[in-house]
Structures are given as C-alpha cells and as structure tokens.
A protein has these predicted regions:
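Donor-binding/catalytic cores of nucleotide-activated saccharide
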Residues: 2-112, 116-132
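C-terminal subregions of glycosyltransferases and related glycan-biosynthesis enzymes
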Residues: 110, 117-183
Length: 183
C-alpha cells in the first residue's frame, strides 16, 4: 500500500529520474521472497557511466529490466516521445522501453522492498509459445541500437550494446524457446 508514496519520496529525496523497486514472483507453488538481489541505493549514472550500469546492474539482473517495477517521470517520457513498441514487432517491449528510458537518466534510486507480486501462471504470455521470437528479439536489438545512436550515446555504449543484444537474443531467447522453432 505504500509503493507509490515510497517511490515518489525516493525520487524527491534523491532527485532521481527513475525509481526501481523489487517484486515477488508468485506461482502455483506460492509466493517467493524478493526476486531481485538489489539494495536500497542511489546511483549517479553520469558518474558511474551508463555502460557500467548496464554491466553491473542490468545484465546480471540486479535491477531487472521490466517496465512495471519502476516509477518514471512523465516529462522525460513526453519530451523524448517514448512509447511501447507493438508486441507483434518486439518481444519484451517493456525491456526496450526501460532501456530507452535509461538514455535520459542521470540519477537512479533503488528500493529493495518487494512492493509488487508478479503472478506467473502456466497459461500466461510467458508460459506460451512465442511466435517469431527470434525476429522480434532481433528487432528489439535493432531499435535499441538505433535509439542509442539517435540519443548520441553510441560511442559511450559501443562496447556494451553488442553484449546487451547478444544477452537478450541468445541467452534469454533460447531460454524462452529452446526448440528455436521460429529461427
């Protein structure tokens, strides 16, 4: 019940453009503890470097990649015309949105408390066959690369971007569709 108030307070206290909070996975086996190995902290992304953030927090899934466990600033979304990509074109459109939003973050606040219960059912989208998964993940990689260039951050992220794309396509894609039926 305090998720929004706590996230807004963290944003105001730290000046963060993004607040990330933890969640619990709920399956038919019950409710798990906090999913993400995060801690309460404030990160100066400008000082740390965005590439370093991706390596230390994004890819090892310390802060997750989901768009729904974050508090965003509307002005950043509107000024940069950020929108979700159509799901038939992109798989993990929330991941793409979150990565694009990070191009505009200078300060990030993380809250370790799991505020959200993420219900994962066997018949949910994540449990179903994902048509054209590889094509949709490749499209995600291309769109992220294009957006990074449009933001003028391509040199800064030159070494991390191929790893991000590989991680999403190969590691996550094969895990989600080990048969590779759509390749």
């Amino acid at each position: 019940p305090t998720m929004l108030a706590d996230a807004v307070a963290a944003a105001q206290r730290t000046g963060a453009q993004l607040v990330i909070y933890n969640y619990r996975l709920v399956t038919e086996d019950g409710v798990q503890n906090a999913c993400l190995p995060m801690k309460d902290e404030t990160l100066d992304i400008d000082q740390m470097g965005l590439a370093n953030y991706f390596y230390r927090y994004w890819m090892p899934y310390v802060h997750g990649q989901e768009a729904w466990c974050r508090l965003y600033r509307r002005d950043i979304i509107e000024q940069n015309h950020l929108r979700y990509a159509p799901n038939d074109e992109i798989f993990a459109e929330d991941t793409l949105f979150s990565a694009m939003y990070l191009m505009h973050v200078h300060t990030l606040a993380a809250l370790a408390i799991p505020y959200v219960n993420y219900l994962q059912r066997g018949d949910s989208l994540m449990g179903m066959i994902k048509p054209n998964l590889c094509r949709r993940l490749i499209t995600l990689s291309v769109r992220l690369t294009d957006y990074v260039k449009a933001c003028g951050r391509d040199k800064e992220l030159a070494d991390v971007l191929p790893v991000l794309c590989y991680d999403k396509l190969i590691c996550k894609g094969i895990r989600l569709d080990p048969s590779l039926e759509d390749v």
